[in-house]
Amino acid sequence: MEEAPAIGAVPVTDTPAVAARTHAENTAFLVIAAVSLCHLINDVMQSLLAAIYPMLKRDYGLDFWQIGLLTMTFQGTASLLQPMIGLYADKRPMPYSLPVGMGSTFVGLMVLAFASDYLLLVAGAALIGIGSAIFHPEASRVARLASGGRYGLAQSLFQVGGNFGSALGPLLAAFIVVPRGQASVAWFSVIAFIGMAILWQVGSWYARYQARATQRPKATRTVTVARHKIVIALVVLAILTFSKNVYMASISSFYTFYVIDRFGVSVQVSQVMLFVFLGSAAAGTILGGPVGDRIGAKAVIWVSILGAVPFTLALPYASLEWTIVLSAVIGLVMASAFPAIVVLAQELVPGRVGMVAGIFFGLAFGTAGIAAALLGVVADAKDIAYVYWLCSFLPLLGLLTILLPNLKRGEAAA
């Protein structure tokens, strides 16, 4: 595989000399493409769980709180383990943990395919969560190492693989799993093996990179942000991640039920509508990172979270046609925030790439999982439409973006 410049394994400074070495041609796009493709594969398998919720609800007689518990098990497991794995890998990099994570997701998928009761469904969801916890921090680190200094672009390309994977899941469920039944989930084992093979090669590149990195002199970033401002900024970024992911969880877990209940569409049509939302989110992810490289992460966060407010407020009152349009706009706008959030957090805490990625990916999974469970309880107590009215106010938390520092290239935290 193509080899990346020495970026991201340790804190570095963006001096003019370094900037001169980090032109686009030095960005290891082959490596970034590989981890992005595997992110797609990983998240296709993950999204199949949520995509077959209507089928599982029908076949197992589940309540909404049980649907929410499946999401909480998957995302809660991932959220608890990711920061710990990221912190450990900052000290002891684990290049070959990537195919292991994919293997755990594969096993979880097989358990889901042949589960005969609800407890086995929960076990399958937990194994998928463990796979995500192993995959995301190290894969995010590899994308940064291969970025050639274009951190926002690399983070977007990495994350968009996951977004496209999440978008493909409902379509695959609609046209393969729903017509053929739960056992057909096992067919996707083929792409899991492909992913494991690719990640083994990525792990080999990563190991060679780490071997060279130990021989280089370490550089440090210039201290320009006070520590108390770092704490405030990280708390704000966590709150913004919470607001974004709770709203996104309301869509990914319950959108199909919402459109079926309100507009009387079929399960397959509801899956296609979910694909429209998730596909738009993938497009937003592509835009967020490169735009952040040009205009700054803070500006992207302003637009992506607070800018979604008019559309989320309008969604509960929209017709079927406008629901499709509004959900697409919401997905496009809100999804552009996360690459910028991760990059800004990594700039604030230099030298802790894996830990920061683990915390924010873990926070994203955890808040979404807890939200899915709680929103399921609300949906049982009230109705699905009430859930979307309640969640429509969450993007107003984007006003907290005003508290974030204005970092320029070459600046970092203490």
What kind of region is each of these model predictions?
Residues 158-207:
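Helix-loop-helix hairpin linking two adjacent transmembrane segments in secondary transporters
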Residues 47, 75-83, 166-167, 278-286, ...:
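Residue-level signature of mid-helix packing/kink "hotspots" within the transmembrane helices
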Residues 292-341:
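C-terminal transmembrane helical hairpin of 12-TM major facilitator-type secondary transporters
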Residues 81-93, 284-296, 379-380:
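Helix-to-loop junctions at the C-terminal end of transmembrane segments
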Residues 124-161:
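Cytoplasmic helix-loop-helix junction between adjacent transmembrane helices
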Residues 49-50, 232-283:
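Extracytoplasmic gate region of multi-pass secondary transporters
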Residues 80-119:
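Conserved MFS/SLC helix-loop-helix module at the cytosolic interface between two early adjacent transmembrane helices
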Residues 61, 93, 114-119, 148, ...:
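Helix-breaking motifs and short loop linkers at transmembrane-helix boundaries and internal kinks
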